[in-house]
Amino acid sequence: LGKAPFMPDEYFGREFNPLDIGLENCQTMIIFPAVSGFVGGDITAGMMETVNCNELTLYLDIGTNGEMALGKGDRYVCCATAAGPAFEGAQIELGMPASKGAVDKVWLEGRRIKYLVIGNDRPVGLCGSGLIDALAVLLKAGIIDENGTILSGQELPILFRSYVFEVEAEETAQSTESSLAVHIAPGVYITQEDIRKLQLAKGAIAAGIEVLFKEYGCMPCNIYVLTFAGGFGNYIDKASAAAIGLFPQELLDKAKEVGIAAGNGAVSAALSKEAWERA
């Protein structure tokens, strides 16, 4: 995977002997066909289960490798983007998985930033959905500008000045970011460096979508439905994602969650020969 272009030895899409991997109580094992080295069989399975072949569909599976596909009928284009782990809470100062104590929802209510915590417990950090919400809220409140820079002093709306504070800057020669941070919940904050990492992840996904539009020769207005697959895609607030530029704003009304589409596709193929042949 470290060389470009990475060409896998096999694209699968066939039946295997379960005994080869030590599965003794299984009659047949099938592995969905991969599209390329970075677009695997999970995308094939998910699209088979959710994509309407007659309508132009944009399929997103957001994760460390943001895999996506666009098309209809017998023509699809796909790509994978190096979004990195920021949306999963990794490499964020107070980032964490979506578990007990994670702030998973953030919104603006009047002059206050409000939040929800998984398990209704003491807030410990921010998971992916909370991070996306937080960025959208900071932008809406005028706490960050359109470039993602945390504002200070007279630049800040007076109602939100108490949310911004200074943290100890890391003593690294490479760090050029300010030492400002923003309170989200008691003991939980987001730093300028965190925002930059989230911008990189967001930019990778947005760039992938733009490339698909260019390759397919279409525009956002041509899309019939935007589907979000996978666990993370089910939980992010689509309005917040559109507000920070993860996908075009005009697709917001066309966005929907399709659950664990790859798992559902695998079940369909296991139970139906017709579904497996279609994959």
What label would you give each PLM region?
Residues 1-15, 30, 45-130, 237-259:
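Glycine-rich phosphate-binding loop of actin/hexokinase-like ATP-binding domains
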Residues 2-81, 110, 152-208:
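ATP-dependent carbohydrate kinase catalytic cores
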Residues 41-49, 202-203, 255-279:
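Glycine-rich phosphate-binding/hydrolytic loop that grips phosphoryl groups
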Residues 71-74, 82, 109, 137-145, ...:
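Short, well-ordered loop/turn and helix-capping segments at boundaries between secondary-structure elements
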Residues 78-190:
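Acidic-enriched catalytic cores of C-N bond-cleaving enzymes acting on peptides and small amides
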Residues 209-224:
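Phosphate/pyrophosphate-binding loops at sites that engage ATP/ADP/AMP, CoA/4′-phosphopantetheine
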Residues 220-240:
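Glycine-rich phosphate-binding loops at beta-strand->alpha-helix junctions
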